[in-house]
Each structure stands twice: as structure tokens, then as C-alpha cells.
């Protein structure tokens, strides 16, 4: 049996956490031969609820679970963590402006960045799911100077999967027959779902759909899918977010299929003229536990404009919290 991997999850008693933990425990994220130790973090008032989640995890008697710890202290939950899923975040309350939300989360993610810096494995892979995910990831990264900045990522795999599903519905293809979708930019309504390089059953996607549908239906549907789910369900997307977090980590650790890429929000290295340092979603290939941004894709005028609009939002978000960053 392999040595267990330590997986830290914040906000572990929340809706996404509840959908996530049982999938991790059953081997969906790291493989059916990889034991895990779950290190669960919650705020103090939620520890009792977390106890109930742990009871359920125990009652499943998962063969791959080597241990479970719970804590309301980030340093304890992140101790020697190999993977950290930062799910817990301050939700947007009534009357809160985006700036208020950014500042409220800056405090949380600064503290978590410091705790990761002090306690986690030096190779820890960090995925931020809690919104605003891209900038929360940047805040954590800037507070963890001793860790590799490239190991701080944010989730746009949910947007990627949403885009694949929309294109599958439109073309009548199965989602497995759709390759090389791209989400550029922020996990927000400015993101740019790009089908210009996408293949459906080996055929170029742009030739299979009307341009009008692409620009005026597909793009806004993907951008606003989260809001549509809240409207329909009365609660935000939790199971689909958890599933996409599992996809993101699985591909990062175990690799993307040969000849295919996925979408990951990663620290920009200036690729495609995007400002360095912001956490921006790019097409990425993963192998040997590392990722690379796909280079040399041709960018037309329409795409360039959309890519810059979402970049602008990320720069504004960074600037709004810059005074709180080390």
C-alpha cells in the first residue's frame, strides 16, 4: 500500500465540503490505490456539525481513509499537508459590495497563507475554491513566501465543465467527445469561455455552432451559470463545485490525458500578454505532478478583447487588497 497523502480541507462542514469529503475518501481524487489522511478545518461554531460529518465518514468504513483530524486552528489542519483545498470563505451578505467581500476574505486567506507557510509540506498543492477564488489564492500565496508561488491555484474547472456541458447539449455530442475547451481569466461573470480551439468528435467546434449562439447564448450562459443555479435551487452550486475541485486536483496530480488540456487558474507568468502575478485561468497540461500553460495558441481580436476584460477585473481586485498584502 502507498503511504497516505495528507489532504487538508477548510470549511469542511459546509455544503461543498459535505459533497467533497466522501468523494476524496472513496478514491475519486487521487486514485483507488492511494490512502488519505483527512485534516479538516472549521470555524469554532461549526465544530459540532463537523463532528457529525466525521461520524458519517467513519460509518462509511472507507478502505482508503487512514485517519481523520479536525481543528479550528489552521496550523493544526495544515500540518504536513500535501494537498490543501481552501473551500471555506466569507459569503457575500446583503448590502455587501465586492470590495467588502474582498477585504473580509483577505483576512481569512492571509491567515491561511501564513499557516500553510509555517506548517504544510514544502510541496503542498493549494486549490482555492472559496470566492473570490482567484484573488483569495493570490492573498494566500503572498502570505506564504517560503512556498513555491506556482503551487497556489484557483478553480475554474467548474466553469470549464459547465462550458463542456453546454457545448455537448448544443451539438448532441457526449461531454467525453469534447476536447480542449478553454476558460480564460477570473472565476466570475467576466470569465471568457473560448471554443476557438475546441474539438467536438474531432471536428472544430466553431464550424458546428452559429456565431450568434456562441457570442450571445453560450458565453453568457456559462458566465452566469452560478447565479442561475442559486435562482433555481435556492442555494449555490455545491456538488458540482466539489466535483470540479476533484477533477482539478486529480489532473494536477495524475496528469491530463495525452494531447488534451484543462483550465486552471494559476499565477500568470506573462503568457499571452497577461499581467504577471495575478491568478488567471489558462489552458494547462499536467504531468508528473506539475502543470504547464499551453503556449503559442493563436488569439484573434474577439478573444483578445475578452481576455483583457477579465484581466482588468483581476488587476482591480488585486489593487483593492494590495494594502493588505505583504
Curated annotation (Swiss-Prot):
Taking the record's annotation, the residue ranges forming a coiled coil are none
Query: Does the record bear Protease in its keywords?
Result: no
Q: Which reaction does it catalyse?
A: (S)-malate + NAD(+) = oxaloacetate + NADH + H(+)
- Amino-acid positions noted as binding substrate in the UniProt annotation, renumbered to this chain: 92, 98, 131, 162
Q: Which CDD domains match?
A: MDH_chloroplast-like (cd01338)
Question: What PROSITE patterns has UniProt attached to this entry?
Answer: MDH
EC number(s) from the headed UniProt entry = 1.1.1.37
Q: Mind telling me which Pfam families this protein's record contains? A: Ldh_1_C (PF02866), Ldh_1_N (PF00056)
Q: What class of enzyme is it?
A: oxidoreductase
The record places the active site at 187
**Biological process, per Gene Ontology:** malate metabolic process; tricarboxylic acid cycle
Q: Which UniProt keywords apply?
A: NAD, Oxidoreductase, Tricarboxylic acid cycle
Task: Output the InterPro entries linked to this UniProt entry.
Answer: L-lactate/malate_DH, Lactate/malate_DH_C, Lactate/malate_DH_N, Lactate_DH/Glyco_Ohase_4_C, Malate_DH_AS, Malate_DH_type2, NAD(P)-bd_dom_sf
Binding of NAD(+) occurs at: 11-17, 105, 112, 129-131
Q: Please list the GO terms describing molecular function.
A: L-malate dehydrogenase (NAD+) activity
Q: Does the keyword Oxidoreductase apply?
A: yes
What domain of life? Bacteria
Q: Which family does it belong to?
A: Belongs to the LDH/MDH superfamily. MDH type 2 family.
| Functional description taken from the UniProt entry | Catalyzes the reversible oxidation of malate to oxaloacetate.
The record's NCBIfam families line, in alphabetical order, gives:
MalateDH-SF1, PRK05442.1
Q: What is this protein called?
A: Malate dehydrogenase
Organism source for this protein?
Answer: Alkalilimnicola ehrlichii (strain ATCC BAA-1101 / DSM 17681 / MLHE-1)
Q: Which gene encodes it?
A: mdh
